[in-house]
Amino acid sequence: MCIGPAPTPETEEELPPSPQHVLTEKDHQRLRFQRNIGVSAHIDSGKTTLTERILYYTGRISQIHEVRGRDAVGAKMDSMDLEREKGITIQSAATFCDWETTDVATGNKQNYAINIIDTPGHVDFTIEVERALRVLDGAILVLCAVAGVQSQTTTVDRQMRRYGVPRISFINKMDRPGANPWRIVNQIRSKLRIPAAAVQVPIGIEDEFKGVVDLVHWRSIYNEGQKGNEVVISQEIPESVMELAKAKRNELVEQLAEVDEEIGELFLNDELPNNDQIAAAIRRSTIALKFSPVFLGSAIKNTAVQPMLDGVCAYLPNPAESEVLAHDTSLPSSAPQVQLTPAADAPLVGLAFKLEEGRFGQLTYMRVYQGTLKKGNQIYNARTGKKVKVPRLVRMHSNEMEDIESIGPGEICAIFGVECSSGDTFTDGSTSFSMTNMYVPEPVISLSIKPKGIETPNFSRALNRFQKEDPTFKVHIDHESKETIISGMGELHLEIYVERMRREYNTDCVTGKPRVAFRETITQRADFAYTHKKQTGGAGQYAKVVGYIEPMEPDPETGKDVAFESVVMGGNIPTNFIPAIEKGFYEALEKGALSGNAIFGCRFVLKDGAFHAVDSSELAFRLATIGAFREAFKMAKGVILEPIMNVEVVAPVEFQSQVIGGLNTRRGTIVDSEVRDDEFTAAAEVALNDMFGYSNQLRGSTQGKGEFSMEYKHHMPVLPNLQKDLEEAYRRTLVVKK
């Protein structure tokens, strides 16, 4: 699905065939003061702490609790015991709150309803971030004032672009020694390649950080009171920052002039825009994904969080301003997508974006895009065609809930008692719309798992539930070793599930050594003409398939890189056998001939064939296809691929040579390095196969002061010597089996 600006149709005829439901004045009134936002960042940028402050200042919680459970309570948004203990957010919790803003010009107060989704910052939980961004209209990108743009920040940035999510940036931890917001603003421009400018200037820095100067409305904002509850606004700008504030306001106008026509014209005519014109330009260019306003603050010191909340209301879009497209499944797949309208009286369209096993059965988080969802309604699952009743409708606050009777378009809610999978679309049955499925990355690591002692029903129950909740967590049985294999996005990802099994299902497990998910692919086109014949008395088997296989690039939208095409003309192969041929192709992809790993990046084109009136069957064509594929694969110059990871290491400067040396010994390619006052960051691309045991080595070589994060980048062909070793090892296993 594409959430974000779609290309503007040139003419009336090109408009997508959309049932044009017009938004009424009542719809506009309701939507104008509504925001669906996410909080995304690199791990440890202070994302959960910031969300905790937002909930406190909006009156949603009465006390502030810190992350890592220092006060034995833990942050509100981290509702799993495991999250509180490790101090990381694993699941995105969805929360609803209210925020009152004051119009600077008129002094009028206005109440906004905000849905916040707190997303995990750890790369192993990327799917949670993808799901959250998919249902948002805007996001807050949190950056650390010292570390700045880190590896996961660029991942989140890429995901925001994929789903077209406008963002405001918040530079947190302004109280930390070494905080330098201007370096971070430059990093946002250079590393994330989005025009950005600060809309605030700090009053004092590091432990002197007291407040901010609002560059748009030209005033000073301070926080007072023990928890920063009181916001004190002064029209006086402190003398110490006056020059800097003037320079940064000019910089803001210059940046806006490049992305906004109105400001650009004023700029060319040497006219200065007024405060309202600047604010309107920031809103326009942020929603158009051309600009990101940068706010500064310190969540842990309760400073400048409220002005950032005002920024959410002022600059991020409401549900009527973000474009949502759906597929009409009654039309051919090449038909243009249909635009949905957040009108309350339009036919219902909603997306289940997250599942949880609650105390009262399955809890399904849903965003309603169009129409109204009422308790007791009958709704249809677009994927399965099943009709279900909504027995209970709730609004979530992390893991507490309030019952509601109905929910309108543009809102996020949770429903009980509805069986479905993550990414399912629900309608009222009058339309055939489907929000296309989310982009799900392939797993890169797997390990065998078995329960200690006797296997209980809880073991399979847990695995089933985790697979339903998380599409990147896969389970299969290895046919040869009969072991249960779990696969995921990283060691921590799998570790968390093994740990959840112990806590939530009382099942202790033994795990095997982690294994890398190698793949196979082809590098050139190969033709095939294969006949499968078997005569065993009675009806035999006969099928002939002719065509070719060729390399295929992944689809940028869906990530799909295997495809089956049939261009058979005439009746050489009856159409009822084509699905069997397709099935045979997908079966052949499961195990490559080189190393026994799955095959990717391949298109199978069926051109011709032959059949026998008596001896041809679905089985015969399936077996013919498998045989044809294996024969063609030998001529298509197959190679083994391995996952390459983006690795980012942060360590004190004195260990720079040891860290670089350690990455070089693991065949890493250093792609970037940056030295700050007393620490440095190295970014490298390293094969996952060479990364085992790296955390211990890094701890040893940096006296425990270094830390690293890694994230899957892509698969690349292995070195010839490794390919030879893998092929030999696979051949040996085949000999043993014989």
UniProtKB/Swiss-Prot annotation:
<dbReference type="Pfam" id="PF00679">
    <property type="entry name" value="EFG_C"/>
</dbReference>
<keyword id="KW-0648">Protein biosynthesis</keyword>
<keyword id="KW-0251">Elongation factor</keyword>
<dbReference type="GO" id="GO:0003746">
    <property type="term" value="F:translation elongation factor activity"/>
</dbReference>
<dbReference type="InterPro" id="IPR035647">
    <property type="entry name" value="EFG_III/V"/>
</dbReference>
<dbReference type="GO" id="GO:0070125">
    <property type="term" value="P:mitochondrial translational elongation"/>
</dbReference>
<protein>
    <recommendedName>
        <fullName>Elongation factor G, mitochondrial</fullName>
    </recommendedName>
</protein>
<dbReference type="InterPro" id="IPR005225">
    <property type="entry name" value="Small_GTP-bd"/>
</dbReference>
<dbReference type="GO" id="GO:0005525">
    <property type="term" value="F:GTP binding"/>
</dbReference>
<feature type="binding site">
    <location>
        <begin position="118"/>
        <end position="122"/>
    </location>
    <ligand>
        <name>GTP</name>
    </ligand>
</feature>
<dbReference type="InterPro" id="IPR027417">
    <property type="entry name" value="P-loop_NTPase"/>
</dbReference>
<feature type="binding site">
    <location>
        <begin position="41"/>
        <end position="48"/>
    </location>
    <ligand>
        <name>GTP</name>
    </ligand>
</feature>
<dbReference type="InterPro" id="IPR004161">
    <property type="entry name" value="EFTu-like_2"/>
</dbReference>
<keyword id="KW-0496">Mitochondrion</keyword>
<dbReference type="InterPro" id="IPR009022">
    <property type="entry name" value="EFG_III"/>
</dbReference>
<dbReference type="InterPro" id="IPR020568">
    <property type="entry name" value="Ribosomal_Su5_D2-typ_SF"/>
</dbReference>
<feature type="domain" description="tr-type G">
    <location>
        <begin position="32"/>
        <end position="320"/>
    </location>
</feature>
<feature type="binding site">
    <location>
        <begin position="172"/>
        <end position="175"/>
    </location>
    <ligand>
        <name>GTP</name>
    </ligand>
</feature>
<comment type="pathway">
    <text>Protein biosynthesis; polypeptide chain elongation.</text>
</comment>
<dbReference type="InterPro" id="IPR047872">
    <property type="entry name" value="EFG_IV"/>
</dbReference>
<dbReference type="InterPro" id="IPR000795">
    <property type="entry name" value="T_Tr_GTP-bd_dom"/>
</dbReference>
<dbReference type="InterPro" id="IPR004540">
    <property type="entry name" value="Transl_elong_EFG/EF2"/>
</dbReference>
<dbReference type="InterPro" id="IPR031157">
    <property type="entry name" value="G_TR_CS"/>
</dbReference>
<dbReference type="Pfam" id="PF03764">
    <property type="entry name" value="EFG_IV"/>
</dbReference>
<dbReference type="GO" id="GO:0005739">
    <property type="term" value="C:mitochondrion"/>
</dbReference>
<dbReference type="GO" id="GO:0003924">
    <property type="term" value="F:GTPase activity"/>
</dbReference>
<dbReference type="Pfam" id="PF00009">
    <property type="entry name" value="GTP_EFTU"/>
</dbReference>
<dbReference type="InterPro" id="IPR014721">
    <property type="entry name" value="Ribsml_uS5_D2-typ_fold_subgr"/>
</dbReference>
<dbReference type="InterPro" id="IPR041095">
    <property type="entry name" value="EFG_II"/>
</dbReference>
<keyword id="KW-0547">Nucleotide-binding</keyword>
<feature type="region of interest" description="Disordered">
    <location>
        <begin position="1"/>
        <end position="20"/>
    </location>
</feature>
<dbReference type="Pfam" id="PF14492">
    <property type="entry name" value="EFG_III"/>
</dbReference>
<comment type="function">
    <text>Mitochondrial GTPase that catalyzes the GTP-dependent ribosomal translocation step during translation elongation. During this step, the ribosome changes from the pre-translocational (PRE) to the post-translocational (POST) state as the newly formed A-site-bound peptidyl-tRNA and P-site-bound deacylated tRNA move to the P and E sites, respectively. Catalyzes the coordinated movement of the two tRNA molecules, the mRNA and conformational changes in the ribosome.</text>
</comment>
<dbReference type="InterPro" id="IPR009000">
    <property type="entry name" value="Transl_B-barrel_sf"/>
</dbReference>
<comment type="similarity">
    <text>Belongs to the TRAFAC class translation factor GTPase superfamily. Classic translation factor GTPase family. EF-G/EF-2 subfamily.</text>
</comment>
<dbReference type="InterPro" id="IPR000640">
    <property type="entry name" value="EFG_V-like"/>
</dbReference>
<dbReference type="Pfam" id="PF03144">
    <property type="entry name" value="GTP_EFTU_D2"/>
</dbReference>
<dbReference type="InterPro" id="IPR005517">
    <property type="entry name" value="Transl_elong_EFG/EF2_IV"/>
</dbReference>
<keyword id="KW-0342">GTP-binding</keyword>
